[in-house]
Amino acid sequence: MEGIMKKFFALMTLIAGISFSLDFACVDTNKVIRESKFIAKAQTELRKELEKYQKLIQEKQKKLEALKKSLESKALSEKAKEKKAKEIEQLEDELRKLQVEAQSKLSRKKAELEKMVFDKVIKIVESTAKKKKIKAVFDCNSMLYWDKKIDITNEVLKELDK
């Protein structure tokens, strides 16, 4: 009986040692995205860039519509109509190029901002984990249950928005 108790005690000690060495935490990434001022600023920057391109495209579209209406004028000579048709063709080409450029630049800008945000969040999570001697950090949203004591989201948010 004493041998069984020693084995049981040794097993419990081993299990207790394992559970203490598995220090982990979680970060609610949805909350970080939703509440971070840093991320909101990056999104605003992207939105401004989008609005700038939308304005340029709308201006070209209005100009194109005006040219098309003037082409319908019966007062224009054939030579003037040909000139207007070439202007329309040129403007349509410019508009297509602008749309492609806008899409490309916005995609690139979005990727740059996402990488910058991701890198900063990872750096903060790593720093926080090292300070607290945490061995692993998970996304709270992928866990079925967690004790709120292991949630370091607010610390990450505070550091991110400094």
UniProtKB/Swiss-Prot annotation:
Pfam families the record matches: OmpH (PF03938)
Question: Per the UniProt entry, what is one GO biological process?
Answer: chaperone-mediated protein folding
Alphabetized PANTHER family for the sequence: CHAPERONE PROTEIN SKP (PTHR35089:SF1)
This protein's source sits in the domain of life called: Bacteria
Query: What Gene Ontology molecular function terms does this protein carry?
Result: unfolded protein binding
Name recorded for this polypeptide: Uncharacterized protein aq_157
Coiled-coil intervals, chain numbering:
32-118
Q: Which SMART domains match?
A: OmpH (SM00935)
> Which residues does UniProt assign to the signal peptide?
1-21
Which keywords does UniProt give here?
A: Coiled coil, Signal
UniProt similarity note: Belongs to the Skp family.
